[in-house]
A protein has these predicted regions:
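Vicinal oxygen chelate
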Residues: 1-65, 91-126
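Mid-chain, well-packed structural core segment of small domains
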Residues: 69-97
């Protein structure tokens, strides 16, 4: 029987698996100040570096090939020590294969309960 989490308990991914909260990504169709363009992914990001809570805005170009769930539903992002290990250990449903949006970082998107979740591995930790 699956354990029901109480209101005062942290999610299992943090409490037991050791994942660390990194940011929340929110899709938008509005231009945001300080946008940075990621040409290989065809979208703009902003807000992350200024937000004390890790709020990141994402504005997608027409023709962006990322999964529509990523483009339309906010996602949580967690830092993990070994992205591929976590995916296989927990039998996670991958909706965007591991890729590198920048130097020293690998990300993948999974789906849980209809919502996208980003896993981030920083290669400097290796």
């Amino acid at each position: 029987m699956k354990k029901v989490r109480l209101e005062n308990e942290l999610p299992e991914s943090i409490e037991k698996w050791g994942w660390k909260y990194h940011h929340i990504g929110i899709p938008t169709d509005k231009f945001m100040p300080g946008e940075k363009y990621l040409p290989h992914l065809r979208f703009f990001v902003s807000g992350f570096s200024e937000s004390p809570f890790g709020i990141e805005w994402m504005r997608f170009e027409k023709g962006c090939t990322l999964n529509k769930l990523i483009q339309t539903v906010p996602h949580l992002a967690f830092e993990v020590a070994d992205l591929n290990y976590e995916i296989s250990l927990h039998n996670l449903k991958v909706i965007s294969e591991p890729n590198s949006p920048g130097d020293g970082i690998i990300v993948a998107m999974i789906e849980d309960n209809g919502a996208p979740v980003e896993l981030i591995e920083f290669l400097k930790n290796k």
